[in-house]
Amino acid sequence: MISSTTNIILAFMFSLLGTFMFRSHLMSTLLCLEGMMLSLFILTAFSSLSSQSMIMYSLPIVILVFAACEAAIGLALLAMISSTYGTDYVQNLNLLQC
């Protein structure tokens, strides 16, 4: 269990690192955010199974709801930016003009 928890934490850290490294493209950033949410979901599912608290059993479902909302908003923004500017390259956007 310890090695799987370590692997999940490493997956979260690599996704966080990918978010910082590939922040110029919106699609890459969204994929890294989904990796972070997936690792958080698996980590909370493991921790809710190991603890015997009834409150912890609903936490993975709440994280899945937030991940679905984040994915929907991210894809809507990606579609809007791609149709408006023709690319997902974030460095070309001037957010003060939006």
From Swiss-Prot:
Major enzyme class: translocase
Subcellular location: Mitochondrion inner membrane
Signal peptide region: none
UniProt keyword annotations, A-Z: Electron transport, Membrane, Mitochondrion, Mitochondrion inner membrane, NAD, Respiratory chain, Translocase, Transmembrane, Transmembrane helix, Transport, Ubiquinone
Catalytic activity line of the entry: a ubiquinone + NADH + 5 H(+)(in) = a ubiquinol + NAD(+) + 4 H(+)(out)
Listed GO CC annotations: mitochondrial inner membrane; respiratory chain complex I
The keyword NAD is annotated on this UniProt entry: yes
Disulfide bonds: none
Enzyme Commission number: 7.1.1.2
Entry similarity comment: Belongs to the complex I subunit 4L family.
PANTHER family: NADH-UBIQUINONE OXIDOREDUCTASE CHAIN 4L (PTHR11434:SF0), NADH-UBIQUINONE OXIDOREDUCTASE SUBUNIT ND4L (PTHR11434)
Function (record text): Core subunit of the mitochondrial membrane respiratory chain NADH dehydrogenase (Complex I) which catalyzes electron transfer from NADH through the respiratory chain, using ubiquinone as an electron acceptor. Part of the enzyme membrane arm which is embedded in the lipid bilayer and involved in proton translocation.
Protein name: NADH-ubiquinone oxidoreductase chain 4L
Gene designation per UniProt: MT-ND4L
